[in-house]
Amino acid sequence: KLPHQLVESFKSTLDEVHEADLLLHVVDIAHPQFEAHIASVNELLAELKVQDKPTLMVFNKIDAYKAEAYDETDLVLERGSEHYSLEEWKETWMSKTEGDAVFVSAAKKTNMEYFRNRVYQKVREQHITRFPYNHFLYPEIEVEE
């Protein structure tokens, strides 16, 4: 959870999201509590009444992600999300966001071209929706991971 005083001090900065065409929700996937962080941000976006803005989830630090070891012979311990592989997280979040998630390592430059192309594609979608006869300003590109 984000401390309340921190949220209050950044309220004016956060109000800028009202003007944004696209939100990039950057998440540190290597942090053990990253899902709680996502929930906190989503609550804040709901408070600001911008939870329905187009959003691209950006899961960063894939190079640092380590799943907790799981012993399949242990009959007491259930396998939880802390044991998910990076691939399992990708499948989970691609499903939850209907494909609006990218997994990158900014430090290692992994998947950065894909990230740039997805941002371009999302902005292009917004532009074409608003200005249907100006689609030539944003030529279509191939987006492959």
Report residues per predicted region.
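Inter-motif core of Ras-like GTPase G domains
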Residues: L6-H31, E43-V50, S105
